[in-house]
Amino acid sequence: MQASEKTLNEIKAKLPYVEVKKDKLLSIVYVQKELLINTLKAIKEDFGFKLFLDHSVVDTLEAQNRFEAFYILYNVDTKERIAVKTRTEHSLPSAEKLWFAAKWAERECYDMFGINYEGHEHLVRAFMWDTYNYHPLRKDFPLQGYETVELPSLNETVFGDNLSNTMNYRRTHTYVPTLKDLEYTEKNRIKKKAQVVLNWGPLHPGTHGTMWFLFDLEGERIVQTDVILGQLHRGVEKLAEHEPYQQFLVYTDRMDYISALCSNQAWTVAVERLLGIEDIVPIKAKYIRTMMSELQRINSHLLWLGTYALDLGALTIFLYAFKEREKIMDIIEGITGARLTISYTRIGGVRMDLPEGALEVIESFIKFFPKELKDWEKILSRNRIWVKRNKNVGVLTKEDIYFYGLTGAVARGSGVFYDIRKLEPYDAYGMVEFDVPLGENGDCYDRYLVRIEEMKQSIRIIEQCVQKLKTMSPNEPFMAESQDPKKLRLTLDGIGLKVPVGEIYSSGENPRGELGFYINSKGGLKPYRVKIRPGSFYNLCVYPHLMENRYVADAVTILASLDPVVGEVDR
């Protein structure tokens, strides 16, 4: 929930130089940039907002202090969220000493907006290669980029200028990185301290995506690690500024493509909150969205478990997990019509009602799946090799969770109670019963146990949703209807949907942690700015810390326990 009026007044009393603002959607503290670090430190240490969630920038194109920067922080004791804002023309002080997660967020802002962070230890680009000359999220940067390089396609080369009058003819294109650019980027990221720098990725089965890791090795011990991101960067946040709210839904499918339904749901709920229409979304749609997201959560965890086990040599579990996962994929395909990129939710409901017989098929699955899960636990949980590879490996304390901005099963594996479904319930999560499993030691083994238990809790949630949906008539609405279509147009295609002026930070509990959306609306059909807070991005930022003084063999184990998806990391 947003920070209360009382909390904001206490901050104002302690820090009289700040301005505070409270509304239903966002609680904000405004401060001059010269006092930013002192303010962040006081809010963290004196008011308990220890968990770093996100930091980014809005380009307002104003003549002075063009960029509005914001920090999203969370108090795990009072369960309050707050935003700290400041303005700048081109530079800000770095907050990396307060939170390591800020270091990665600042690199992203430098990359996308050109903001210089004073005191940043190693300010390099986050997604683009280091010799790139532009900052794509600035408002004066065109959507298609600057087409300055002559790079004709094969057809244009063969037919020459005979194609010059056709719509597909383009003699110039945007610049793409050369091998020389990538070599420079690699050398700029890590300064060798030990014997040899080992490249892992960007295309390797163990990374489960196009992630590029650099290990500085002393024998088989890793002295330092760096991660080069951006191989799957597609400019999703830039695209969001040019798409209607409903049309942007298809891009959420393509971030964490393993759990597209959960991403759909998080975006839809964020826009509904900004519109103020949560109360008119049909109860049937809320239960359907919750049930489908929990099926997707199990689906995601099964993929994680199968590939995790395979990476450590347990082929049997990989085969068992994928057999059950295929059943869920068939259920999802039967209901939504797609297996991977689904786009099932709609602003105001869902795309279509459940087909006849869907609930019976789901009931059949959740009846037999718990037994399968129990059998897998017998195979893995006390297996000597599995325990040896996971116990006391990749240990994270509670303070690490706050410092690195970690969420999801990674945070809960260290005993931090942080689950958006419980803390800020959306859709039907406030109407169903389930427990939040917590670890004790914060190692890879605890993160494994937490995800196993999460699948059991997802079954509980699905059971309750199925029972509730069975009591509902097929004629009950699955899409909200506007009281005044002239002011608010709610349709399946989303055409004509206008969102009022305002801003919001709203998040959902994805299988990989908190998926947050900061939406800034100037009114109209399209958002002015969308900042996506992916759980995978921040969970990955702790990886270099966990790899210090570990063996190369631990690289796969620790990475798998964090469970990043590169589509969500790179966006």
UniProtKB/Swiss-Prot annotation:
The keyword Disulfide bond does not apply. Pfam families: Complex1_30kDa, Complex1_49kDa. Residues 1-171 are annotated as: NADH dehydrogenase I subunit C. The keyword Protein biosynthesis does not apply. Its EC number is 7.1.1.-. Gene3D superfamilies: Cytochrome-c3 Hydrogenase, chain B (1.10.645.10), NADH:ubiquinone oxidoreductase, 30kDa subunit (3.30.460.80). Residues 194-571 are annotated as: NADH dehydrogenase I subunit D. SUPFAM superfamilies: HydB/Nqo4-like (SSF56762), Nqo5-like (SSF143243). InterPro entries: NADH_Q_OxRdtase_suD, NADH_quin_OxRdtase_su_C/D-like, NADH_UbQ_OxRdtase_30kDa_su, NDH-1_subunit_CD, NDH1_su_D/H, NiFe-Hase_large. GO terms for cellular component: NADH dehydrogenase complex; plasma membrane. It is a peripheral membrane protein. Keywords: Cell inner membrane, Cell membrane, Membrane, Multifunctional enzyme, NAD, Quinone, Translocase, Transport, Ubiquinone. GO terms for molecular function: NAD binding; NADH dehydrogenase (ubiquinone) activity; NADH:ubiquinone reductase (non-electrogenic) activity; quinone binding. It catalyses: a quinone + NADH + 5 H(+)(in) = a quinol + NAD(+) + 4 H(+)(out). It is found in: Cell inner membrane. NDH-1 shuttles electrons from NADH, via FMN and iron-sulfur (Fe-S) centers, to quinones in the respiratory chain. The immediate electron acceptor for the enzyme in this species is believed to be ubiquinone. Couples the redox reaction to proton translocation (for every two electrons transferred, four hydrogen ions are translocated across the cytoplasmic membrane), and thus conserves the redox energy in a proton gradient. NDH-1 is composed of 13 different subunits. Subunits NuoB, CD, E, F, and G constitute the peripheral sector of the complex. In the N-terminal section; belongs to the complex I 30 kDa subunit family. In the C-terminal section; belongs to the complex I 49 kDa subunit family. This is NADH-quinone oxidoreductase subunit C/D. It comes from Hydrogenobaculum sp. (strain Y04AAS1). The gene is nuoC.
